[in-house]
Each structure stands twice: as structure tokens, then as C-alpha cells.
Amino acid sequence: MKVEDFDFDLPEELIAQTPLLDRTSSRLMVLDKESGDIKDQHFTDIISYLNEGDALVLNDTRVLPARLHGIKDETGAHIEVLLLKQKEGNAWETLVKPAKRIRKGATITFGDGALKATCLEELEHGGRILEFSYEGIFYEVLEQLGEMPLPPYIKEQLADQDRYQTVYAKENGSAAAPTAGLHFTEDLLEQISAKGVEIIFVTLHVGLGTFRPVDVEDTTNHKMHSEFYRLTEESAERINKIKAQGGKVVAVGTTSIRTLETIASRHDGKLVAESGWTEIFISPGYTFQAVDALITNFHLPKSTLIMLVSALSDRTKILAAYNHAVEEQYRFFSFGDAMFIH
């Protein structure tokens, strides 16, 4: 299919710049993936669509304050570093600006010297492999010195950085939030659990590639970025049991779908304990093996994520729903409203 087939007109004022005061006060568009019927509801209405014996699968990744500002030791030049992916030991794949100032062997100091980095390797497009040295625990040092790397379409400063974390975020490693999960509070999850819905966690560390534009004309030529995922034995067994008993598997976010479908596609539809790197690209024509329904936000035009949701329903129904969202003034993207496709 052509990437242009997934385009739609989005007024800039509908791109949410800040989160709502209350996480659960978002709106919820409910889309019947077969008929295309649309209902305009509130996010807390999601409870009525989840039944006893269903599974609600959430991604427990935690966003790192991955943007660092430092000084090149040799010259005093200001350097910005964005952590992308952990390699072996204390080495990270990073994006450096201005990259031309950091060549192999260059060193950078952050803060008062609590964190230092040495360039081990130069990559293309401003990428660098940096090895960090520090005292104590790396993630604690990062909390002190780093900033949250908000998406490029968010122009305003975030007053409370916790609002770019889910309430259940636990596993450090993401460069961006799994934003469908931002709508949940602990109280709402307790209400869902009390109804007999099983709350199950997976881990997928979201990379900045999630914001990268698709730069080919035909979707078949697109190569996805790789992201680390993990599914525990307990979670795999619980989901398999629910599916065997006829319960629905409802994924919260495209990252949860990508984790489950990566594993199911390798094991004849079954889920097993597994961790690794996935480059799965889900687009129309894909047959889902693990997931029945999806809670997600509204995505960018011509993005791999709108292609994914089009695979779960179909492109025409999704674009009709998106046009309805524009007409009804839904809020779009990371801090925007939600959609339930079932």
C-alpha cells in the first residue's frame, strides 16, 4: 500500500500540548472494528467494555530522563546527548548534537562531574556510542541530571514530569512513553480488576524511532526500528489460559500489541516467556494471533502506528473515525484522547 493512503488533515490546534488535570478525564472514541460504528464516550466508560475473564495487557516500561546537557572536556563546547539504547555494560547508543564536535575518543562531563562519557564509536546521522562512568547507580544519577525527552510535536515545557509516566511504570529503558497507558489511574485499574478482568504486564522499551517519519512511498519497503521487549513466564501462561477459556485480550497501546504479536507470530499463536529485540511491522493484511482489542491514542498521519490500527480494523474505517475525531475536536497524539478498537 502507499504511505499516502494513510494521510489525513489534522488542524495543529488539535495536537494536545499538555496533559489534562485528571488522567481519566480524557474522551474515549469507541470503534467497532467490523461495522465501523462509532461512539463518543469518556475514558472511564472503558470499564463497561471489559468483562470478567478478559485480560488487560499494559506495558510497564519507564521513560528515562534521557536528554543530557554536558561540556566537551577538550574545548568547553556545549553538547546535548540523547540516550537511545543501552548496549553492553555502561555503553549506550546515543544521539549527539552537534555531532561534529564529538569524535572517537572525545570526553564529555555532565553536571558537576557526577557523570562522564567517552565516545567509543561514531555512527551515521549524529549517532554515537558513549561509555559512561559514574559513582553509584546510573539511573539515580540520570534522575538528577537528565530531562524528559518529549516528542517533537510537544512545544511546551512539562510542569510535572510524572505526567509523562504511567502510574505503573517500573522497568527503566524507554525514550518515549507508552501513551495509551497515561489515561489510567491506580483507582481505575482497581475498579477494572474488581470486575474480574486480569491486569497483566509486558515490557517494551519505546525507542525514538516511534516518531521517525516513514521515508518510503510504499509500506512494503519500510523497515522498522528495533525495540527491546520482555514477556515473563507468568504473564504468558495467564494470557494463554484466558484465550483458551474464551476471554478477550485487550492491549493497552501499540507497544503491548507489538510485544504480544512478535511472540505469538513465532510460536503458532501461543505466548511463551521471551525477551529480545523486535522489528515487527504491523500493517493492513496482517493476521492478529494474540490480541482481540486495543486501547490507543490518536496517531500521526502516515505513521506506522496508524498503519497498525488500520490492520486491526481496516484503513477506510480508521480514516473515517479519525475524520470524525477531527470534526468532534478530539485531542491528538501523546497527551490527547483515547480510542478503543474492539
UniProtKB/Swiss-Prot annotation:
Disulfide bonds: none annotated. It is an enzyme of class 2 (transferase). Pathway: tRNA modification; tRNA-queuosine biosynthesis. It catalyses: 7-aminomethyl-7-carbaguanosine(34) in tRNA + S-adenosyl-L-methionine = epoxyqueuosine(34) in tRNA + adenine + L-methionine + 2 H(+). It comes from the Bacteria. Keywords: Cytoplasm, Queuosine biosynthesis, S-adenosyl-L-methionine, Transferase. InterPro entries: QueA, QueA_dom1, QueA_dom2, QueA_sf. Its EC number is 2.4.99.17. GO terms for biological process: queuosine biosynthetic process; tRNA wobble guanine modification. It is found in: Cytoplasm. GO terms for molecular function: S-adenosylmethionine:tRNA ribosyltransferase-isomerase activity. The keyword 4Fe-4S does not apply. The keyword Manganese does not apply. One of its GO terms (cellular component) is cytoplasm. Belongs to the QueA family. Transfers and isomerizes the ribose moiety from AdoMet to the 7-aminomethyl group of 7-deazaguanine (preQ1-tRNA) to give epoxyqueuosine (oQ-tRNA). Monomer. This is S-adenosylmethionine:tRNA ribosyltransferase-isomerase. The gene is queA.
